[in-house]
């Protein structure tokens, strides 16, 4: 399974083509749009999300509510394009018109793709870089992940996410599955412990008032994953390696870990390895889950726990020092409309990116042309965990 996105932040639309979804999977566009709506929420978002009403139009690959097995094309319209039609349109415009609209960017933002992207593609107007490097593209990735979540639900695989930390204020590292699920989306910072939600909001407000931004840590959990998905044989088939690549490909994500993650470096092996147990109902299972459901690059049947680190957004309303690429003079960096904190929304993006990586790995492990075939293979693998 693979996908390709296209579109710019202030262009007319985002388009995504997904190839490899099995036939006969029931798809309701409202289920996808429900996930799209979640991405737009969260405390700390900027004015852009007040303009956009992200909904998906499916234009190929689904007929009368069921997938055909052919490529699925989805479109997300950018409502803000109305204000950018001339500057972002395909038709040529004069340099005078461009200057009059004050949309040319020559002062790159530290921490963004602006300067290096301009060098790489020889763009003297850095808007050509930031329009594509913008996190607006993640709307298309959430649409892909939403499709994958529908597939995973048919296989009795649950995936959900939360915020663990914002600006140094932390929720508990781990919760039991029941507590986690019962408290999803109960507040606008997406933490389980309501008592720290206001402290996080205050931290976000403080950053906004200072013209600054803050980052944090998100967590994604995948439950009821069959054993043995991934491989120990080759580096590029390891499931944790694939998930890690997907997570750090999200805008502003700078780190990823599994289970206890970097804390594993502080403990002896006897406190980190998960002991193997067996009973006739569950088959093999682990007495703990310090490793986050992954051993030797493969799923071991325990919940897969993924932690992603998001740096503060690089666009600041109190901009840092930069250099004008035309005059080489010192200037403050360009200011673009942005969020002061996008960690709650990023947890949704991360959830859907992980959903894609999980679905892709499953479809490689259990090659199937239609959903019924895939379901049967999953049943057989789960039975193997009991009978082996």
Swiss-Prot record:
Its EC number is 4.2.3.5. Its cofactor is FMNH2. Signal peptide: none annotated. InterPro entries: Chorismate_synth, Chorismate_synth_AroC_sf, Chorismate_synthase_CS. One of its GO terms (molecular function) is chorismate synthase activity. It is an enzyme of class 4 (lyase). Pathway: Metabolic intermediate biosynthesis; chorismate biosynthesis; chorismate from D-erythrose 4-phosphate and phosphoenolpyruvate: step 7/7. Keywords: Amino-acid biosynthesis, Aromatic amino acid biosynthesis, FAD, Flavoprotein, FMN, Lyase, NADP. One of its GO terms (biological process) is amino acid biosynthetic process. NADP(+) binds at residues 39, 45. It catalyses: 5-O-(1-carboxyvinyl)-3-phosphoshikimate = chorismate + phosphate. NCBIfam families: aroC (TIGR00033), PRK05382.1 (NF003793). This reaction introduces a second double bond into the aromatic ring system. Belongs to the chorismate synthase family. This is Chorismate synthase.
């Amino acid at each position: 399974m693979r996908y390709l996105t296209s579109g710019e932040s202030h262009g007319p639309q985002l388009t995504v083509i997904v190839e490899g979804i099995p036939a006969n999977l029931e798809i309701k566009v409202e289920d996808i749009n429900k996930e799209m709506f979640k991405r737009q929420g969260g405390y700390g978002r900027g004015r852009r999300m007040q303009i956009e009403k992200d909904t998906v139009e499916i234009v190929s690959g689904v007929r009368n509510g069921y997938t055909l097995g052919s490529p699925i094309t989805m479109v997300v319209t950018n409502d803000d394009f109305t204000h950018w039609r001339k500057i972002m349109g395909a038709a040529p415009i004069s340099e005078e018109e461009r200057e009059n609209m004050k949309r040319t960017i020559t002062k790159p933002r530290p921490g963004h793709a602006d300067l290096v992207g301009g060098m790489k593609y020889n763009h003297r107007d850095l808007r050509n870089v930031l329009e594509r490097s913008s996190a607006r593209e993640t709307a298309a990735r959430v649409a892909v992940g939403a499709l994958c979540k529908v597939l995973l639900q048919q296989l009795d695989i649950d995936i959900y996410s939360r915020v663990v930390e914002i600006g140094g204020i932390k929720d508990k590292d781990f919760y039991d599955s029941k507590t986690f699920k019962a408290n999803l989306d109960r507040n606008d910072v997406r933490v389980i412990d309501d008592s720290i939600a206001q402290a996080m909001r205050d931290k976000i407000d403080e950053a906004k008032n200072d013209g600054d931004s803050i980052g944090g840590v998100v967590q994604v959990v995948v439950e009821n994953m069959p054993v043995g998905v991934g491989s120990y044989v080759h580096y590029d088939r390891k499931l944790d390696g694939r998930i890690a690549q997907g997570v750090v490909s999200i805008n502003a994500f700078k780190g990823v870990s599994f289970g206890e993650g970097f804390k594993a470096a502080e403990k002896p092996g006897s406190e980190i390895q998960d002991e193997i147990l067996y009973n006739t109902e569950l088959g093999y299972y682990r007495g703990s889950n310090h490793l986050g459901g992954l051993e030797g690059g493969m799923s071991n049947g325990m919940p897969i726990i993924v932690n992603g680190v998001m740096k503060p957004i690089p666009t600041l309303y109190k901009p840092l020092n930069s250099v004008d690429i035309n005059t080489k003079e010192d200037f403050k960096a360009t200011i673009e409309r942005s969020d002061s904190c996008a960690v709650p929304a990023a947890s949704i993006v991360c959830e859907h990116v992980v959903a894609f990586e999980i679905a892709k790995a499953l479809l490689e492990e259990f090659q199937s042309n239609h959903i019924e075939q895939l379901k049967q293979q999953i049943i057989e693998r789960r039975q193997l965990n009991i009978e082996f």
